[in-house]
Amino acid sequence: MTKSELIARLAARHPQLGTKDAELAVKVILDAMAKSLSQGQRIEIRGFGSFDLNYRPPRVGRNPKSGEKVRVPEKYVPHFKAGKEMRERVDQKN
């Protein structure tokens, strides 16, 4: 599902919200989540899952074109872990 599909589904499910209102709601939620993660905070949505940051230490990588060794700096990457209810719902569908 894309962001625009989510907005369309939200607007269809709640007719009192216009498409612009649904778009604003999705934007505000995603912006708040991105801001929290960028500040190093963990996000937990009960029944859905949690978002946090995983540390990746510095390493030596390889340039795929030249084969030359390249130093890759340390970084933090977003990580999502599905909650128990979400895992069970997905498992029932398969």
Swiss-Prot record:
Q: How does it assemble?
A: Heterodimer of an alpha and a beta chain.
Transmembrane segments annotated in the record for this chain: none
Which cellular components does GO assign to this protein?
Answer: chromosome; cytosol
> Which species is this record about?
Nitrosospira multiformis (strain ATCC 25196 / NCIMB 11849 / C 71)
Q: Name one GO molecular function term.
A: DNA binding
The entry's family comment says:
Belongs to the bacterial histone-like protein family.
Give GO BP annotations, semicolon-separated.
DNA recombination; regulation of DNA-templated transcription; regulation of translation
Q: What is the protein name for this chain?
A: Integration host factor subunit beta
**The protein's role, per its UniProt record:** This protein is one of the two subunits of integration host factor, a specific DNA-binding protein that functions in genetic recombination as well as in transcriptional and translational control.
Which is one Pfam family of this protein? Answer: Bac_DNA_binding
Write out the entry's keywords from A to Z: DNA recombination, DNA-binding, Transcription, Transcription regulation, Translation regulation
NCBIfam families assigned to the protein according to its UniProt record, in alphabetical order: hip, PRK00199.1
Please give the PANTHER family that the UniProt record associates with this protein: DNA-BINDING PROTEIN HU, INTEGRATION HOST FACTOR SUBUNIT BETA
